[in-house]
């Protein structure tokens, strides 16, 4: 049994299989998951686990080169955005797109990780970097 790192077997498998430029979405309770895209449902109850808790574990284990966020988070959830931005290293490219575009982009991700987060626009697509 693993004693550290990502313990959820589905999420660990996705993380282990990521290649350069592969993408994973971490989303809130309400984010729709397109048909055919793997859904890893971590939600236990409203707010648990939080978006930030899941993001922390992901960032500890995966090299990220680019993230996509909904433009709407700036106006509708600035607190979440401020916390999120402190966690990204300076070399991570941040791209803002419309929420509708973000949902369309989810058709191409390796998985959508559903959290218990119940605040608006708490969704991020993380693009894997390469450790060379």
UniProtKB/Swiss-Prot annotation:
GO annotations of cellular component type: cytosol
Pathway recorded for this protein: Carbohydrate metabolism; D-ribose degradation; D-ribose 5-phosphate from beta-D-ribopyranose: step 1/2
Molecular function terms, GO-annotated: D-ribose pyranase activity; intramolecular lyase activity; monosaccharide binding
GO terms under biological process: D-ribose catabolic process
Catalytic activity from the UniProt record: beta-D-ribopyranose = beta-D-ribofuranose
Pfam families according to UniProt: RbsD_FucU (PF05025)
Keywords in alphabetical order: Carbohydrate metabolism, Cytoplasm, Isomerase
Entries under InterPro entries matching the protein: D-ribose_pyranase (IPR023064), RbsD-like_sf (IPR023750), RbsD_FucU (IPR007721)
Major localization class: cytoplasm
Active site: 20 (proton donor)
Sites where the protein binds substrate: 28, 99, 121-123
Compartments reported by the entry: Cytoplasm
Origin: domain of life: Bacteria
Annotated Gene3D superfamilies: RbsD-like domain
Root EC class: isomerase
EC code(s) of this entry: 5.4.99.62
Reported function: Catalyzes the interconversion of beta-pyran and beta-furan forms of D-ribose.
Subunit structure: Homodecamer.
Similarity comment: Belongs to the RbsD / FucU family. RbsD subfamily.
This protein's name: D-ribose pyranase
């Amino acid at each position: 049994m693993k004693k550290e790192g990502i313990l959820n077997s589905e999420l660990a498998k996705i993380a282990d299989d990521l290649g350069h430029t592969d993408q994973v979405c971490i989303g809130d309770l309400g984010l729709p998951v397109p048909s055919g895209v793997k859904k890893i449902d971590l939600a236990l109850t409203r707010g648990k686990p939080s978006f930030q808790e899941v993001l922390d574990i992901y960032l500890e284990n995966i090299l990220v080169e680019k993230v996509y966020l909904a433009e709407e988070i700036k106006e509708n959830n600035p607190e979440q955005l401020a916390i999120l931005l402190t966690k990204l290293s300076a070399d991570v490219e941040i791209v803002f797109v419309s929420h509708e575009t973000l949902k369309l982009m989810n058709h191409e991700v390796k998985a959508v990780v559903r959290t218990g987060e119940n605040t608006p626009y708490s969704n991020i697509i993380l693009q894997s970097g390469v450790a060379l």
